[in-house]
Amino acid sequence: MLVSIANTFGRIFWGAVSDKIGRYPTVIAMFGAVAGGLALTALFKGEGSILAILGVMLVALSFGGFLGSFPGITAENWGVANVGTNYGWMFTAYGVAAIAGPQLGARLAQSNNGDYSMAFYIVIGMALLGIVLQLFYISKSKKA
């Protein structure tokens, strides 16, 4: 239930942040929140750990924000004429991740005696890569 609440609130919270600082800096902040949340979860994964729960909620908060931010980003980059179709293609990444992520995480855990930490660290790296790619995109966009 807490994850659902955080996800729902994330759409509103990150939308307000985006209105203040812009879409792309908000995406960077969300990737940072995902990395931080996953780090808390990986480091404090003991049952009932408040910090692990906070980490999961940070990730859920950001997932809601990504879903709220991507339609505007899609329209900005490819126009509004086909935004529904284009957003559908962008959103497909969530579907692929929903299928592949748990399977890959489970395989990593199996090879590490049931410990999911390696899966968390890989996704933290992916979130940090997201920040780098977003910064690269911003720098290229300003030059164009």
Segments from the language model and where they lie:
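Residue-level signature of mid-helix packing/kink "hotspots" within the transmembrane helices
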Residues: 4-12, 95-99
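Interfacial helix-cap and linker-helix signal at transmembrane-aqueous boundaries
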Residues: 17-18, 104-113
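Cytoplasmic membrane-interface "Motif A"-like loop-to-helix N-cap segments
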Residues: 20-31
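C-terminal ends and interior cores of transmembrane alpha-helices
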Residues: 32-46
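Hydrophobic core of transmembrane alpha-helices in multi-pass small-molecule transporters
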Residues: 51-65
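Intracellular juxtamembrane helix-capping segments at the cytosolic ends
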Residues: 65-78
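Paired intracellular helix-loop junctions of major facilitator superfamily
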Residues: 75-83, 113
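Multi-pass alpha-helical transporter architecture, strongest
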Residues: 124-144
